[in-house]
From Swiss-Prot:
Coiled coil segments of this chain: none
Keyword Protease: no
The entry's keywords: Menaquinone biosynthesis, Methyltransferase, S-adenosyl-L-methionine, Transferase, Ubiquinone biosynthesis
Organism field: Edwardsiella ictaluri (strain 93-146)
Protein name: Ubiquinone/menaquinone biosynthesis C-methyltransferase UbiE
Species classification: Bacteria, Pseudomonadati, Pseudomonadota, Gammaproteobacteria, Enterobacterales
PROSITE patterns for the chain: SAM_MT_UBIE, UBIE_1, UBIE_2
Biological process annotations from GO: aerobic respiration; menaquinone biosynthetic process; methylation
Pfam families named in the record: Ubie_methyltran (PF01209)
Name of the top EC class for this enzyme: transferase
HAMAP family, per the entry: MenG_UbiE_methyltr (MF_01813)
Entry similarity comment: Belongs to the class I-like SAM-binding methyltransferase superfamily. MenG/UbiE family.
Recorded catalytic activity of this chain's protein: a 2-demethylmenaquinol + S-adenosyl-L-methionine = a menaquinol + S-adenosyl-L-homocysteine + H(+); a 2-methoxy-6-(all-trans-polyprenyl)benzene-1,4-diol + S-adenosyl-L-methionine = a 5-methoxy-2-methyl-3-(all-trans-polyprenyl)benzene-1,4-diol + S-adenosyl-L-homocysteine + H(+)
Superkingdom assignment: Bacteria
Gene (UniProt): ubiE
Length: 251
């Protein structure tokens, strides 16, 4: 782990000023936004769709509810939630990055998903919504990019209704030694090459690999959610722990 102080944080394996991280992450996603969906399919061999489907199946979202898809990017989860909540419900796709938000908006409008879906540029650490507003919040592959994760979790807790749930889908720690070694080799040697060939940006995908290693492991994130106020916090390891889905409730 990289040593940190309250004034510094990690950006991949680098130590940077905490105030600078959001801008550096923004540069990464401005760079890859146009190829984001294609790269997700290529680098996960399409398995990210199964991870997201499992998240949706675990959400418990029903007709008429209000859902926040945080760090929603190009809108894979928001599109499904829009259909699930129906005309009387509401889905907000929020992302701090305007390039990702623009592509998500265009993609979903081209799919004919309008009416109950709104778009908000927002920082997860200071969500611009009232207290007790959402029935469900999801954040998929976004929490590791947040500078102050504890602050972001508290912000999510604040805007979640009593009885509501948070689902955090994120890269995590493989549970088997052989899988971990193979995953490291793929992440650090093959993934940046794919990024260079397809998105013309190997550095951003090298950051991706590093940011995954710096993200809290399954048990640590579970404890962070509990510290933010969430109860009955559990997680499921997916694909041997390469990804984990954490769930917590506000009572």
């Amino acid at each position: 782990m990289v040593d940190q102080t309250p004034e510094t944080t990690h950006f991949g394996y680098k130590t940077v000023a905490a105030a600078d991280k959001a801008g550096k992450v923004a540069q990464v996603f401005h760079s890859v936004a146009g190829k984001y969906d294609l790269m997700n399919d290529l680098m996960s061999f399409g398995i990210h769709r199964l991870w997201k489907r499992f998240t949706i199946d675990c959400s418990g979202v029903r007709q008429g509810q209000r859902v926040l898809d945080l760090a929603g990017g190009t809108g894979d989860l928001a599109a499904r939630f829009s259909r699930m909540v129906g005309e009387q419900g509401e889905v907000i796709l929020a992302d701090i990055n305007d390039s990702m938000l623009k592509i998500g908006r265009e993609k979903l409008r081209n799919m004919g998903i309008v009416g109950n879906l709104n778009y908000v540029q927002a920082n997860a650490e200071a969500l611009p919504f009232p207290e007790n507003y959402f029935d469900c919040i999801t954040i998929a592959f976004g929490l590791r990019n947040v500078t102050d994760k504890d602050k972001a979790l508290r912000s999510m807790f604040r805007v979640l209704k009593p009885g509501g749930r948070l689902l955090v889908l994120e890269f995590s720690r493989p549970q088997f030694v052989a899988l971990s070694k193979a995953y490291d080799a793929y992440s650090f040697h093959i993934l940046p090459r794919i990024g260079e060939m397809v998105a013309h940006d190997g550095d951003s995908y090298r950051y991706l690999a590093e940011s995954i290693r710096m993200h809290p492991d399954q048990e640590t994130l579970k404890g962070m959610m509990a510290a933010a106020g969430f109860e009955n916090t559990t997680y499921d390891n997916l694909t041997g722990g390469i990804v984990a889905l954490h769930r917590g409730y506000k009572f």
